Amino acid sequence: MEKIWLEAQSNIKKVLTPQTYNTWIKPIHFHNVSDTNLTLEVPSKFIKEWVTEKYLSIIIEAISSLTNIKYQVDFKITEKSQVEKKKVDLQATEKIENDSTRNVDFNTNLNPKYTFDSFVCGASNQFAHAASQAVANNPACNYNPLFIYGGVGLGKTHLLIAIGNQIRENNKKAKICYYSSEKFMNEMINSLRYKKMDEFRNKFRKMDILLIDDIQFMAGKEATQEEFFHTFNALYESHKQIVVTSDKFPKDIPGLEERLRSRFEWGLIADIQPPDIETKIAILKKKSDLNSITLPNDVALFLASSATSNVRELEGMLIRLGAYASLTGSEISLNMARDILKDIIVEKTKDITVEMIQKHVADHFKIKVSELKSDKRLKTFVIPRQIAIYISRELTKASYPEIGERFGGKDHSTIIHSVKKIEKQMENDLEIKNTVEKMKKELMS
């Protein structure tokens, strides 16, 4: 049966986008089968809930087409084995520490909410996520230093702190230091001012794990780079783990000294790309669950499609909607989202026109725009026409009469009928639903 599941996965891969498949279907593994009950393994509760809601029917259909049996599919969450959690080997460190080291406050200011479990992994960040987990479970072995780079608000800090939290969970005695490069610089300046540089150096160079955020802010600051260079060398030579983040690839950071740049390239460099729509939806769903916000699917799609790739801004929009719904005692809806967030995302919805939608739908179904706007009743033209009308209503501010005018002068009752027709079909026909959502994503991305 395991071979059948692998074949089913292969077939499912053909009908989903690569990002969707890699994020939601690829992590699923066969567990067992009994009569007509099939159990599959998923790595988390979140994936279980998302796959059950979005892709269960596709999975059942794919398996049924290979076996001619309609299985009852259940999902089992596979917890990480305690055996798999490698303990950080810090026993080789010196048993005798000097007094100044003993007195160092190892309060690392690691935000407990930033964990690997709370990080939503997708195709855009999969490599950085995997590298971070590898470092957290076996620091200073294969990937030292680890350099994570990507744009603002994509999750670099989340991964950086998650590494620290995981190491702390594995070994309570680990000396972990999490600093922004700006804080490192300010503390160094104060140490110089008050003649406490020995204490400053001792503090950082006796760490087991050094996590530095936004290293690009050291660029052009010679004294700070000089001090960090020697700190880096001391830790690296002592086989301590170093992780840094940046908004740019090392070679693209202006004002960064070549000797630091080359050291960052000694280890592993992992990038984080802007999330695709599927990943943004997953992030919104996870954050809404964590904040007890009921977020309808159409609103999640609207936010993910309209909003920036900056995950923090995306979360900000969600919190704004949640606060409004809570304070007014109302439920979050698509109309509410459009109204409350109009100052943020109005420009993106304005860019989409009925004409753009007509061309996109016509191209998708390989028909002419003139045929889409005509009164021809062939199914070849009717379904694309109704889909185009439905999407026009969803993605533009055009009224029913205005949409009718752009579809060959049809009256508003015909337009309303088309919208309701597609809404009903989307409830009952998964293929129609996927087609419509795919085209909406393409238009809004």
Swiss-Prot record:
Subcellular location(s) of the protein: Cytoplasm
GO terms of molecular function: ATP binding; ATP hydrolysis activity; DNA replication origin binding; lipid binding
Keyword DNA-binding: yes
Any single Gene Ontology cellular-component annotation: cytoplasm
Residue span of region Domain III, AAA+ region: 109-325
Family of the protein in this entry: Belongs to the DnaA family.
Subunit: Oligomerizes as a right-handed, spiral filament on DNA at oriC.
Domain observations: Domain I is involved in oligomerization and binding regulators, domain II is flexibile and of varying length in different bacteria, domain III forms the AAA+ region, while domain IV binds dsDNA.
Role noted for this protein: Plays an essential role in the initiation and regulation of chromosomal replication. ATP-DnaA binds to the origin of replication (oriC) to initiate formation of the DNA replication initiation complex once per cell cycle. Binds the DnaA box (a 9 base pair repeat at the origin) and separates the double-stranded (ds)DNA. Forms a right-handed helical filament on oriC DNA; dsDNA binds to the exterior of the filament while single-stranded (ss)DNA is stabiized in the filament's interior.
PANTHER family assigned: CHROMOSOMAL REPLICATION INITIATOR PROTEIN DNAA
Descriptive protein name: Chromosomal replication initiator protein DnaA
